[in-house]
Regions:
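Ligand-site clamp/hinge motif
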Residues: 294-296, 319-322, 327-372
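N-terminal lobe/hinge region of extracytoplasmic solute-binding protein
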Residues: 71-124, 306
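Detector for C-terminal structural segments
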Residues: 2, 10-18, 37-38, 413-439, ...
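Gly/Pro-rich hinge or "lid" segments in bacterial periplasmic/extracellular proteins
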Residues: 105-107, 193, 197-255, 264-266, ...
């Protein structure tokens, strides 16, 4: 039967090719698209049901039950949402796991609707959060949900966020347990001298209830009397020649979450300070509650996650995850008999799989296809641009440690050239936070406006001399925030080459990219990155952009606390960790210049990297001269401002305080904002009730098939 279906599909595809080629021949795009159709058909044959004569109606699959088939552009890195906090994983686990709180569809505010709680109570001092669980809730394996099980989930998140091998992966749990978001146990030490205002950074506790100390990076800061919202004009001293600064004394920190316990059948969470973000953070799929029986000794899952949601995972193989209804679900039974979530990394493959009736809906529709899909009766709902595409700049890199180089990159990028690869509604990003938060950033453009002459002068100030900077980006994948990574990379890097930067592309598989993009490293230079905001709070944007620096500090705290006798792993006392020391200053670049030219076009795949053609990069113009460098706050000061904003008593007060953070991040420049992007979904007419979400993670349990 399966072979018959494949043969039928092949014949149909061949007829379509002949019909199209008959009168006008095939363009290159046609050839690519029909090739995509053939490969998509092969990938989906195993799970495709009988096609309908009307593609826009989808294939009803009456004989096989009500099966909803969805294609996304990236495979789940793994099905553990805590260790794989990416949209492709969340899209699967959102159908399986439930969280303590959910986000209101319209406002994003944390709520108990469709959550595991029937009540959420916050004490007057905002330090104690009590979660009263619903009665008679069971995991899909029949095990009852208890407060003790929820406590074990919190303990797991803590262990992963503070573990040496997982700290860089568990980005959503960083504000709960890792470095910088809790409360410092001693004030930052300030140098009283007039010409040095270094402040030590800090790390979070390895355990939820205890403080920890870590050696942090010495970082010069802006004068305390300086208005943080003042003009961003280039001022201050030119490049310094010293290579390093002395490490300061350790600073102890208490994490945000200090205790989680069961009390009278409820879960009680105690915080070290008030936090406006805390409830919002818990709405993420990373905090979906999983049966603790699956937690291994290393806190990693021993099998696919088992949750309390409307569906359970039946299988996951060959890029397709099959979900079946959870017989123990206590809510309204879904009107679907099965969900199939497959991976098609090309928008052409997804488009033709949709019009051929192989799938019922797909993510990330190519802008050029929207008109035809609408004319053919497909639904094409869009998502708000609650997202960010950016360049992460590794402050532990020997070149990017220099603040003038990071600022030069910000002034070099041509954001306007990137719009051609995104749907209408995409806009330039001037800051690292979504405009929807309405945070005033009066001087933001001074840090991000394109100015090639200033960029070249800043490189001269830093002493840049053609040193190589590697740029990581994901290859052979399609993401909600970047449908065509290779094209976006090539367009972006061209503007960096124009000002004289020597950029070498490092295309990575999706799995490699996810593992390396946040890990402490002095090798990674730039990473082309992005995300959709996963919860309705500004830290949903600041957190991912700062995650690599937070991970570095967290690993540093683990090393500081490790016994002298340990000789393996990153806990070895002799290990040399990458350091962001001096990342807020203009310490002159010490790295050896490279005779190699810069790579202009990106290779099509990691395998082609070695044979990628190179083109000489323009050198900085001879007239480029050093310029005064504006002072920057330290990373510790930025985190201090973030904590102050998050502790505010109201959203309005928070907004004003976060304006300071936006300015500080513009000065420090740990990442270069590029775009706030939107994306589209294509859905056949047979699907009813499809509702897009601001965070690009949709729920399928309430869908209906006609």
């Amino acid at each position: 039967m399966l072979n018959d279906h494949r043969a039928s599909s092949a014949c149909k595809n061949a007829e379509l090719l002949r019909a199209t080629a008959g009168s006008r021949g095939l363009s290159r795009r046609d050839v690519l698209r029909f090739g995509a159709l053939l490969s998509a058909g092969t990938a989906l044959t195993a799970c495709a049901s009988t096609g309908s004569s009307n593609p826009a109606s989808g294939s009803s699959a009456a004989s096989a039950g009500r099966i909803f088939r969805f294609a996304q552009g990236a495979a789940p890195v793994q099905l553990d949402p805590a260790l794989s906090p990416v949209a492709s994983t969340y899209q699967v686990t959102a159908q399986v796991l439930q969280t303590l709180l959910t986000a209101d569809h319209y406002t994003g505010s944390p709520d108990t609707t469709d959550s595991l709680c029937r009540e959420w109570k916050v004490s007057d001092d905002r330090l104690t959060h009590t979660f009263v669980l619903r009665d008679n809730v069971h995991f899909s394996n029949g095990t009852a949900l208890t407060a003790a099980a929820v406590v074990q989930n919190f303990q797991r998140w803590q262990a992963l966020a503070t573990g040496e091998s997982t700290a860089a992966l568990v980005v959503p749990a960083q504000p709960l347990y890792a470095w910088g978001f809790g409360v410092p146990e001693q004030p930052a030490q300030k140098d009283a001298s007039a010409d040095a205002s270094a402040t030590p950074s800090a790390t979070a506790s390895p355990t939820a209830g205890a403080s920890a100390s870590a050696t942090a990076d010495t970082q010069s800061s802006a004068s305390p009397s300086e208005d943080p919202n003042s003009s961003g004009s280039q001022k201050g001293a030119t490049a310094k020649t010293e290579a390093t600064k002395p490490e300061p004394k350790p600073v102890s920190f208490t994490p945000l979450v200090t205790s989680v316990k069961e009390q009278d059948g409820a879960v009680v969470v105690t915080l070290s300070r008030p936090s406006l973000a805390f409830g919002c953070i818990l709405t993420q799929q990373a905090f979906g509650i999983i049966d603790p029986a699956l937690f291994g000794s290393d806190q990693k899952l021993t099998s696919v996650p088992v949750g309390t949601g409307a569906f359970r995972i039946e299988s996951s193989e060959k890029g397709t995850v099959r979900l079946l209804p959870n017989e123990h679900f206590d809510g309204a039974r879904p009107q679907l008999d099965e969900i199939q979530i497959s991976t098609l990394t090309s928008s052409d493959k997804r488009y033709f799989a949709l019009v051929e009736g192989m799938i019922d809906a797909c993510d990330q529709v190519n802008s050029s296809d929207l008109g035809q899909l609408a004319r053919d009766g497909y639904q094409t709902p869009g998502r708000d641009p609650f997202s960010l595409v950016y360049l992460h700049l590794n402050t532990a890199h020997p070149v990017l440690k220099n603040i003038s180089v990071r600022r030069a990159i910000s002034h070099a990028v041509d954001r306007g050239a990137l719009h051609q690869y995104y749907p209408q509604g995409t806009s330039d990003a001037q800051t690292l936070v979504s405009p929807s938060f309405r945070i005033q950033a009066d001087h933001a453009k001074e840090h991000t406006d394109r100015n090639q002459d200033l960029s070249r002068s800043l490189l001269a100030t830093a002493g840049y001399n053609n040193q190589v900077i590697e740029c990581y980006y994901p290859a052979d994948v399609s993401l909600p925030w970047m449908d065509t990574p290779q094209k976006v990379y090539s367009e972006m890097v061209a503007s960096l080459i124009e000002v004289g930067l020597n950029i070498v592309p490092v295309p990575l598989t999706w799995e490699e990219y996810h593992a390396k993009v946040n890990e402490p490293s002095s090798t990674r230079g730039i990473a082309l990155a992005g995300f959709y905001g996963m919860y309705r709070d500004p830290y949903a944007f600041f957190g991912p952009a700062l995650a690599p620096m937070i991970a570095e500090q967290q690993v540093r705290s683990i090393v500081a606390a490790a016994p002298e006798s340990m000789t393996t792993g990153v806990t070895a006392k002799t290990v040399e960790l990458p350091s962001s020391n001096g990342a807020d200053s203009n310490i002159r670049i010490q790295a050896t210049p490279s005779p190699q030219p810069s790579f202009s076009p990106a290779p099509a795949s990691p395998e082609e990297s070695a044979s990628a053609s190179a083109s000489p990069s323009p050198t900085p113009t001879p007239s480029a001269t050093a310029v005064p460098v504006e002072e920057s706050p330290s990373f510790l000061q930025i985190m201090e401002s973030i904590r102050a904003a998050d502790s505010a008593e109201s959203v309005d007060a928070q907004r004003e305080l976060y304006a300071r953070v936006v300015t500080q991040l513009g000065q420090f420049m740990p990442a270069v904002p590029l775009l706030n992007v939107t994306s589209k979904v294509a859905v056949s007419r047979s699907v009813q009730g499809y509702q897009t979400e601001q965070n690009a993670i949709e729920f399928f349990s309430k869908l209906r098939l006609s």
